[in-house]
């Protein structure tokens, strides 16, 4: 027999002898007469058969009792004895017809006070299924193990929740909506509307305090995001107005593009058409007709241009005082230090644009609901802008190639070169004599309407059916018309 086996045997015998030495009540007089109504004491051992209060136990007795034998006591009273006996180290529970409930509070009290339950093999716990356990009856040893596992799982869950609460405001661990990830925490649809907020107050119970701020930052219609008929948000920011940012090229409004007199602002006209991507024939519409401004009448051009640029300068999109107060309140809760004047519309636009393109800065907003809603709205706005850009580009190409429509800068008498179809023949390029040049020009018998004087802006004889004419300025007839 090896040394280790001998050591294990000695330890087992020692433990058995200790358990065998757990005392019992004798006929000797009690050492705690003040508690003789429910307890019997001898030295550091006590046996109690009534509740802690009925027995008259005191703190002095509890400070010297290290081994306790309890009879006929329910789980709640056993916990009371354990917590009020500071010196207790071993406990024996005698059922005697009293069933113990499957409550882990008893096991947790034993663990907290470092008390050993000496009769685990003989003790049973009943009515366990009523408390959610899989079996209705379990031995003390099995029940103690299950309670230990449950407590460790609860501790791990509590640590994870605390860690998540700490990490909620960590900007470095937050998913960025600009990368397509979902923002941390709840989504926008999970946020129930609230009537009050520690930052701002609102009138309606069915509207979140950040709704108008989100719509202002996003720059589109409130009907897209739960602001029904609020007069504080203008209708000029509808999705159709936003498309103009993507349909046009070179930054011009749709109805105010530069006149294409053939020179194409430094780009040579090729075969009677504008440069690739310009969206259709230069000149566009039939000869003799009035100039056409795309889908708008001529008088509406200036109005449309003014409305498309009024988001910062004022006009219909000027936000109300109540919305401005909400914006000030939300931005006041951030930790962003920028040299801007919140009352200056230009500075306010810069700040909101800065927040929009650096959305992680909004993580310092004090109200989690406002923060989540702003981040979600920004993500949705970017997706809509990408969709609008693709749709607007397709519509720009289609509208530019449509007959009678202005591909770039309006229809009517374009300057240097008409399209081959309007020259009276087929677009055959340089093959043979230009077809249609020998016939009377249809639609050009008199001074073309909208061109000022006959053939002004044509730039001399056509050279090469579409090569850039030489020498004369272009588009003068258009301007004079």
Curated annotation (Swiss-Prot):
GO CC annotation, single: acrosomal lumen
Comp. bias intervals (Low complexity): 417-440, 464-481
Compositionally skewed regions (Gly residues) per UniProt: 406-416
Organism superkingdom: Eukaryota
GO biological process terms, semicolon-separated: cell adhesion; fusion of sperm to egg plasma membrane involved in single fertilization
Region feature Disordered, mapped onto this chain: 154-193, 219-243, 376-481
Main location: cytoplasm
Pfam families: Bindin
Compartments reported by the entry: Cytoplasmic vesicle, Secretory vesicle, Acrosome lumen
Keywords, comma-separated and alphabetical: Cell adhesion, Cleavage on pair of basic residues, Cytoplasmic vesicle, Fertilization, Signal
Keyword S-adenosyl-L-methionine attributed: no
Acidic residues bias: start-end ranges: 379-389
Propeptide boundaries: 21-245
Signal peptide residues on this chain, from the entry's feature table: 1-20
The keyword Transferase appears for this protein: no
Composition skew (Basic and acidic residues), residue ranges: 154-163, 178-189
Region (Fucose-binding domain), start-end ranges: 352-360
Its job: Species-specific sea urchin sperm protein required for adhesion of sperm to the egg surface during fertilization. Bindin coats the acrosomal process after it is externalized by the acrosome reaction. It binds to sulfated, fucose-containing polysaccharides on the vitelline layer receptor proteoglycans which cover the egg plasma membrane.
Family the entry assigns: Belongs to the bindin family.
Protein name: Bindin
Lineage: Eukaryota, Metazoa, Echinodermata, Eleutherozoa, Echinozoa
């Amino acid at each position: 027999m090896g040394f280790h086996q001998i050591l294990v045997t000695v330890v087992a015998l020692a433990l058995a002898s200790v358990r065998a030495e757990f005392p019992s009540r004798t006929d000797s007089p009690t050492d705690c007469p003040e508690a003789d109504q429910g307890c019997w004491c001898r030295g550091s051992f006590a046996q109690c058969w009534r509740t802690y209060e009925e027995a008259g136990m005191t703190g002095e007795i509890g400070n010297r009792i290290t081994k306790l034998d309890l009879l006929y006591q329910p789980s709640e009273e056993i916990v009371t004895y354990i917590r009020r006996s500071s010196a207790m180290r071993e406990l024996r529970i005698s059922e005697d017809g009293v069933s113990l409930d499957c409550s882990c509070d008893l096991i947790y009290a034993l663990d907290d006070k470092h008390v050993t339950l000496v009769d685990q093999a003989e003790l049973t716990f009943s009515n366990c299924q009523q408390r959610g356990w899989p079996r209705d009856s379990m031995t003390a040893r099995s029940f103690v193990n299950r309670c230990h596992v449950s407590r460790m799982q609860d501790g791990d869950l509590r640590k994870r929740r605390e860690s998540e609460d700490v990490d909620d405001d960590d900007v470095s661990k937050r998913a960025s909506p600009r990368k397509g990830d979902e923002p941390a925490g709840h989504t926008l649809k999970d946020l129930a509307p609230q009537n009050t907020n520690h930052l701002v107050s609102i009138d309606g119970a069915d509207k979140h305090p950040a709704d108008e701020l989100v719509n202002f930052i996003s720059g589109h219609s409130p009907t897209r995001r739960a602001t029904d008929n609020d007069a504080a948000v203008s209708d000029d920011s509808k999705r159709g107005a936003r498309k103009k940012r993507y349909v046009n090229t070179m930054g011009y409004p749709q109805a105010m593009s530069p006149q294409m007199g053939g020179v194409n602002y430094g780009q040579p006209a090729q075969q009677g058409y504008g440069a690739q991507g310009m969206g259709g024939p230069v000149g566009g519409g039939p000869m003799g007709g009035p100039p056409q401004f795309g889908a708008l009448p001529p008088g509406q051009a200036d109005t449309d241009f003014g409305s498309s640029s009024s988001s910062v300068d004022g006009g219909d999109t000027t936000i109300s005082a109540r919305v401005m107060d909400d914006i000030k309140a939300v931005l006041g809760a951030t930790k962003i230090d920028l040299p801007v004047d919140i009352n200056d519309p230009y500075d306010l636009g810069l700040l909101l644009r800065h927040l929009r393109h650096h959305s992680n800065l909004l993580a310092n907003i004090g109200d989690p609901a406002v923060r989540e809603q702003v981040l979600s709205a920004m993500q949705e706005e970017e997706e809509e802008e990408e969709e609008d850009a693709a749709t607007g580009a397709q519509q720009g190409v289609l509208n530019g190639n449509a007959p009678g429509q202005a591909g770039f800068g309006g229809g009517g008498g374009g300057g240097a070169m008409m399209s081959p179809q309007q020259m009276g023949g087929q677009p055959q390029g340089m093959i043979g004599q230009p077809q249609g040049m020998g016939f009377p020009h249809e639609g050009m018998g008199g001074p073309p309407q909208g061109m000022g004087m006959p053939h002004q802006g044509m730039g001399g004889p056509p050279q090469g059916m579409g090569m850039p004419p030489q020498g004369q300025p272009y588009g003068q007839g258009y301007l004079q018309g």
